Amino acid sequence: MPFFTIILYLCRQNRMIMQESKEISDYKKNLRGSILETAMHAFAKKGIRAVKMDDVAAALGISKRTLYEIFETKELLLSEGIRKYYAERQDYYRRVTQQCKNVMEVLVAIYRIKVDEFRKTNPQFYADMDKYPKVARFLNQQNQQTHKDMLKFMERGIYEGYFRDDVNYELAWLLFDALGKYVMVNQLYRQYTIEEIFQNLVFVTMRGLCTEKGVKALDKIV
């Protein structure tokens, strides 16, 4: 076989291999996304511990081996799903913060999405997350970031005249965070509706932080 013919043959073979590799890569990428979506939906509906890896594989019509090739453990699957959720949520919050005219409009937008989110999620999902160390560490990091974001949000509210400027917001955040943890640890969401919890925890707290202008705006929301 002539030398150049061999070169052309090898080039064609290489292109075919590269195309096959790309197709496999695209397939795995799409499958990874489908696994995350299916698993997180099941976790939110039934609770994390109630959903087995076998259940996820069966729902997608794939083998357990294929599932474990992409996610070695259930914790890795959950961890990536949680990270994806937080990335999307942060992107949404950034857009809302930029698009809303004032902090009160931001509160309304976030309130609506959070209430809808809690309605669609089995409370056991939140209770189960602490059982997974990687997820718990990530959530702790996110809580620290939320702390920083909240302080900036309050500064904006002070500037706009909706929040009081004589409040220790660092302390207020610590107290609010402690109340939120109390709700979760004692599973108050099993006794009260999400609307009741938000009304009595979030809005009562916010009312104490508002100026007269802020209280009037808050009353329109509630």
Placement of each model-derived feature along the sequence:
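Basic, helix-initiating cap at the start of DNA-binding domains
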Residues: 1-46, 50-62, 76
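C-terminal peripheral helix-coil segments that are non-catalytic and often amphipathic
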Residues: 1-19, 152-156, 160, 192-222
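Amphipathic, non-transmembrane alpha-helical scaffold segments
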Residues: 28, 78, 82, 86, ...
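Short amphipathic alpha-helical segment with a characteristic S/N-K-E followed by hydrophobic residues
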Residues: 35, 73-79, 88
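Short hydrophobic/aromatic patch on the recognition helix
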Residues: 61-71
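Hydrophobic alpha-helical connector segments
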Residues: 80, 91-120, 173-176
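Short secondary-structure transition hinges
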Residues: 115-162
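Hydrophobic alpha-helical bundle segments that form small-molecule/ligand-binding pockets
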Residues: 144-172, 176-179, 183, 187
